[in-house]
């Protein structure tokens, strides 16, 4: 259960998806996932410039701080009821009074615990200030997801997505083929496993 982390995000509002909807669906999912996971990480919709127009057209919006606190209070109570730890991902809002801490989605402490070794990591400097993740290498790439979610910040435009052909599952690349002019460069990596002995 420790190796499985449930994410409930992005939390956004519309005529259909109101606070009551999120409270009900969160409880339904928590009941189903209880015992299979120990933690749920939530995040509220972020207004990235490239998604604003699509959100507005679809009638979707983020939550005010008051709405965030009201929903978080209900979700926190539900999480406790089902034995789940609730944390936020890269959120400035402080919800410790509701029993909700800040998460590290790339959590060096958890990774060290499940792999039974201590890891020497640093905070990922390429993320937002509120992000607590350890430095990592993302295996994804921008402008490659064909799902077309309105709230997705990873694609620049629907028009650009239409130009992507379906990926080849045998290709070493995410959504195309290696061309003769392409240059493949191996990345220099260092092991994160600490070799330093611990006294306690």
For the regions a protein language model found, what residue spans apply to each?
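N-terminal [4Fe-4S]-dependent radical SAM core
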Residues: 99-142, 183-194
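Acidic carboxylate-rich catalytic motifs and surrounding loops in phosphoryl-/glycosyl-chemistry enzymes
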Residues: 10, 43-46, 84-97
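Short Fe-S-cluster ligation motifs
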Residues: 158, 162-200
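Helix C-cap/helix->beta junction micro-motif
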Residues: 36, 81-82
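Conserved AdoMet/S-adenosylmethionine-binding subsite of the radical SAM
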Residues: 1-72
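Active-site/pore-lining binding-face segments in mid-to-C-terminal subdomains
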Residues: 72-81
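Local cysteine-cluster metal-coordination motifs and their immediate loop/turn environment
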Residues: 137-157
């Amino acid at each position: 259960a420790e190796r499985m982390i449930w994410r409930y995000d992005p939390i956004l509002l519309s005529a259909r998806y109101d606070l009551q909807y999120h409270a009900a669906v969160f409880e339904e999912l928590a009941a189903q996932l209880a015992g299979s996971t120990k933690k749920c990480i939530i995040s509220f919709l972020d207004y990235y410039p490239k998604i604003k127009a699509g959100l507005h057209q679809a009638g979707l919006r983020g939550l005010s701080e008051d709405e965030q606190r009201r929903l978080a209070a209900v979700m926190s109570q539900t999480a406790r009821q089902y034995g789940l730890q609730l944390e936020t991902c890269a959120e400035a809002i402080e919800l410790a009074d509701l029993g909700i801490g800040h998460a590290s989605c790339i959590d060096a402490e958890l990774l060290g615990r499940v792999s039974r070794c201590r890891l020497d990591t640093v905070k990922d400097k390429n993320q937002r200030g509120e992000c607590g993740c350890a430095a990592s290498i993302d295996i994804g790439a921008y402008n490659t997801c064909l799902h077309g979610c309105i709230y997705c910040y990873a694609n620049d435009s629907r028009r650009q997505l239409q130009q992507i052909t379906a990926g080849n599952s045998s290709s070493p690349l995410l959504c195309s083929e290696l061309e003769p002019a392409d240059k493949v460069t191996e990345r220099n990596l260092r092991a994160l496993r600490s070799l330093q002995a611990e006294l306690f």
